[in-house]
Amino acid sequence: MAESPSESTSDSLSTTTSTKPAQSGTVSISSPQSHHVVFPEIPIEIVSEEEMAILDAALAASRSILPSVIRSVSPSRITAGGSPKTIRSITLFSKRKLSACSDIEESYLHRFRRNQALGVTDLTGTEWCEKQMENVLCFGRRKVNKAMKVGQARHLQLEEEVVKKVRVKVESNEDKWALKLLNSIAGVNQFLFEGRTRELLLLGFVGGQWIVGIIDELRKAYAEESSDSGPILIDTKTRLRDTLPAEPQRRNGRLQLMLYKLLWDTIVKEGFPTGPFFDYFSLNRNYVLSQDVRDHIANAGIKAQTLEEIVRYYENTFQMLPIANNQLLLKYEFQKDQSIIAEIRFNHDHEWVMSKYREVIEFWRNEREAGYTPEEERWKCRYCQFAKSCPGNPSFESPSTSSPTREAPPLPS
């Protein structure tokens, strides 16, 4: 899609507010399509929660490693036409410090995902190239390019086929989480009654780690395609060219869907650990939700006043569900005319995905150093924004002689 982890499409309940919980804001949430109310079109710049977490963390990291003389430069001086020499010095300094981030002993989980869940796109991005993910965390991701915007717009278009977005004012993190979980509950109910939903947010506890993911599409299996009664998980990826991507990209897509199934099945079979949820995310279980949020919950047909009551609804909703279908579906679509390039069906491989999951978590917990992409896959370096400064790049040259990297998404979505 987009985890991430994410990984990236917008989640079906995308926060568009200030990150300060004390301030009020609005949250966009999805609900099943209604033909009785017409909402005006609002232009939206899609940035998923997982991507915002990466950007926020990268900003914090850059502040922590910049020397005091650079930190003391007034932002107003720079934006108002400050010295080009100062701006160049910051750029050169960031290039020289490309490896400084990994020298800090604190784990990436603690530094960049404190009180946050790891996104599925965090995990798939790490599998793509650990060194690239390390640099993305420490120094930030390049701006969304045209191809990525087209892909994001297509995901939004697909989502709007089955859900509509409404805005609800929020006043705290408890309000935000209540609406996120409510949106998941609504998505599951839509699947149960209509056989299909899109952009379904999942939050679960897998192998000692909180994981969040947004399933692109979820539908009931047709009788002719599977004897398994569980829902089929689907991910649609858009392509600039009407050809299939290389095997490492297809592998990454398969991993993404298997991680969604792992997350779904874990919630269904093992339940939702409510106590650890409130503790890890620093939430007040007895918090009385704001009036606007309570009104929206009531409109959804749920009687709840506190965050804990919504969490219980989320837990009980998934306890009624079957595990996901063992067959998964990865679709590739041509951006130009939205024609289907290929539909790849494959079976879930629990041992393989758990092996990959443990390997990736080791990186996030700093149990080992970040590895470079395998030698046979180092063609990826041609599309990496950090290639000029990365020793793993086969064409690595000194900054004075290297040529610009090619424009392409740094991580698979």
Curated annotation (Swiss-Prot):
Its EC number is 3.1.-.-. Residues 1-19, 394-406 have a biased composition (Low complexity). Monomer. It is an enzyme of class 3 (hydrolase). GO terms for cellular component: chloroplast. This is Exonuclease V, chloroplastic. Its main location: plastid. It comes from Arabidopsis thaliana (Mouse-ear cress). Residues 1-47 form a transit peptide. [4Fe-4S] cluster binds at C129, C381, C384, C390. InterPro entries: EXOV (IPR019190), PDDEXK-like_dom_sf (IPR011604). Single-stranded DNA (ssDNA) bidirectional exonuclease. Has both 5'-3' and 3'-5' exonuclease activities with a strong preference for 5'-ends. Belongs to the EXO5 family. Residues 20-32 have a biased composition (Polar residues). It comes from the Eukaryota. The keyword Iron applies. One of its GO terms (molecular function) is single-stranded DNA 5'-3' DNA exonuclease activity. Residues 1-32, 389-413 are annotated as: Disordered. It is found in: Plastid, Chloroplast. Binds 1 [4Fe-4S] cluster. Keywords: 4Fe-4S, Chloroplast, DNA-binding, Exonuclease, Hydrolase, Iron, Iron-sulfur, Magnesium, Metal-binding, Nuclease, Plastid, Transit peptide. Its cofactor is [4Fe-4S] cluster; Mg(2+).
